[in-house]
Amino acid sequence: MMGIFLASVGFMFFSVLYVQQGLSSQAKFTELPRNVTATEGQNVEMSCAFQSGSASVYLEIQWWFLRGPEDLEQGTEAAGSQVELLPDRDPDNDGTKISTVKVQGNDISHKLQISKVRKKDEGLYECRVTDANYGELQEHKAQAYLKVNANSHARRMQAFEASPMWLQDTKPRKNASSVVPSSVHNSANQRMHSTSSPQAVAKIPKQSPQSGARIATSHGLSVLLLVCGFVKGALL
């Protein structure tokens, strides 16, 4: 009787363990991140969702940036498919952690959002899920590649900003002749008068104050003599 009881207990124990293992094996990604091609300046989203097959203590999603295009071989940049990877390397030395979300329950999802994507954002991204079950930690990974095409307008603006700028004074400038001092004009006029021909100078009679006085005196004497002549004639 005791043996039957022990056998029943053992059967139930192994049955529960088998069910737990079966449920754990059903843990999966319900939404895998997809490869994205964007143009510089656009907003980009990558989605990742996971469902645990058993009651978990907590679920955690981390988004990582692994490496840029210069670290990837030619021809494999956009050809990589969304494949769940096994943890085979040290995660702390694998790239740059971007964000973390942690929940209690069997389902978790998290979107990676990049605003105004730039060329340096291009590369391989990874969604890492940690399933904290009773007694053990399970890690699941999925990757996607972000390709960023150059924006011709943005490139032109960057080239314009990088080029030296020549500033032009828009203030109107005065005529060069108006800036010359008046003394310069006076000296120039004097030089012009001094270099004129002798014939032109000879045509302009010069009168001094003394000559004017002599002319006035002779004119007065002639008038006086004329008056005296009239008086003398009248007396005779």
UniProtKB/Swiss-Prot annotation:
Stretches with biased composition (Polar residues): 175-199
SUPFAM superfamilies per UniProt: Immunoglobulin
Signal sequence coordinates: 1-24
GO molecular function, one term: identical protein binding
Biological processes, Gene Ontology terms: cell differentiation; cellular response to BMP stimulus; positive regulation of brown fat cell differentiation; positive regulation of gene expression; positive regulation of white fat cell proliferation
Disulphide linkage map: 48-127
Gene3D superfamilies in the cross-refs: Immunoglobulins
Induction statement: Up-regulated is response to high-fat feeding (at protein level). Up-regulated by the transcription factor PPARG in a BMP4-signaling dependent manner. Up-regulated during adipocyte differentiation.
Principal location: secreted
Domain Ig-like V-type, residue spans: 27-143
Disordered: annotated segments: 168-213
SMART domains tied to this protein: IG (SM00409)
Glycosylated position list: 35, 175
PTM remark: N-glycosylated. N-linked glycosylation on Asn-35 and Asn-175 is critical for secretion but not for preadipocyte cell differentiation activity.
InterPro entries, per database record: Ig-like_dom (IPR007110), Ig-like_dom_sf (IPR036179), Ig-like_fold (IPR013783), Ig_sub (IPR003599), Ig_V-set (IPR013106), IgSF_V-set/TM_domain (IPR051102)
Entries under Pfam families matching the protein: V-set (PF07686)
PROSITE patterns per record: IG_LIKE
GO cellular component: a single term: extracellular region
Tissue spec. comment: Expressed in brain. Expressed in neurons. Expressed in adipose precursor cells in epididymal white adipose tissue (at protein level). Strongly expressed in adipose precursor cells. Weakly expressed in adipocytes.
Signal listed as a keyword: yes
Xref: PANTHER family: V-SET AND TRANSMEMBRANE DOMAIN-CONTAINING PROTEIN, V-SET AND TRANSMEMBRANE DOMAIN-CONTAINING PROTEIN 2A
Purpose of the protein: Plays a role in the regulation of the early stage of white and brown preadipocyte cell differentiation. Promotes adipogenic commitment of preadipocytes by increasing gene expression of the transcription factor PPARG in a BMP4-dependent signaling pathway.
Description of how the protein assembles with itself and partners: Homodimer.
Protein name per Swiss-Prot or TrEMBL: V-set and transmembrane domain-containing protein 2A
Species of the source: Mus musculus
Gene that this polypeptide is encoded by: Vstm2a
